[in-house]
Amino acid sequence: MRPRLAIFKFASCDGCQLQVIDVLGRARPRLGDLAEVLEVEHFLEARSRIGAGPYDVGLVEGSISTPADIERIKEIRRQCRFLVTIGACATAGGIQALRNWGRIDDFLSAVYATPAYIKTLATSDPVAAHVTVDFELRGCPIDAGQLADVLSAFVIGRKPRLPGYSVCVECKERGTVCVAVARGIPCLGPVTQAGCGAICPAHDRECFGCYGPDRQEPNLVSLTGFYERHGASRESLGRLVQSFNAWAPEFRAEHDRLVGDGAGRETRGP
């Protein structure tokens, strides 16, 4: 009997689910025929048929942003033997976590005609803030090759093989000139987990930290201090780390050290 796979969505843009379709749809032959060895039971992005749980593996895209989301993710956790969060929204709250530095009532009043009807949390949370997660697959969006490795690892019973180094290594591998040293552009590559293939530096752009903080204790204070000494303002560096993975603990702490944590913001609430 094939392992049963389920894919779920919360607050997100669907980009990571499109990568799942890329892998399971065999758009990249080098990834193998994973669709042949996994039984996709729940995937509303790609099909309307829903197979009831329990499931062997659950992939979750998106952040938790409403009280209903909390109850739903708890039920998903109960239904999945292994739970894997995919993408920056699920692993770190996503770009929508920028609201976490403000007051939720201010946002509700600005967006909705009748804010009292809206039930939301004060923060956009990673899935791991509410349930136990077995594995996190980072990225905005995730890399199809890394996803294939994680699913293959589950099927054959081994640990996933993901990069244990920063984006700087990927720049060296592809022969990309360092934008920080050669061009004087503040770049998060030295403190960001590899996985994208250093796409932005290859186009003379700084790394924006799409894959989150490097797993090897990233030294953001040292990096931002270097950029400050070369003319970057604390405000611009605070904005640099306040992007797709802004609510990741390491990036969040460095932002707050540089520019403050937003006086008066709420931390939790319906």
Predicted features and spans:
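Iron-sulfur (Fe-S) cluster-binding modules
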Residues: 1-59, 64, 68-70, 74-82, ...
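Short, hinge-like loop/turn segments at secondary-structure boundaries
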Residues: 100-104
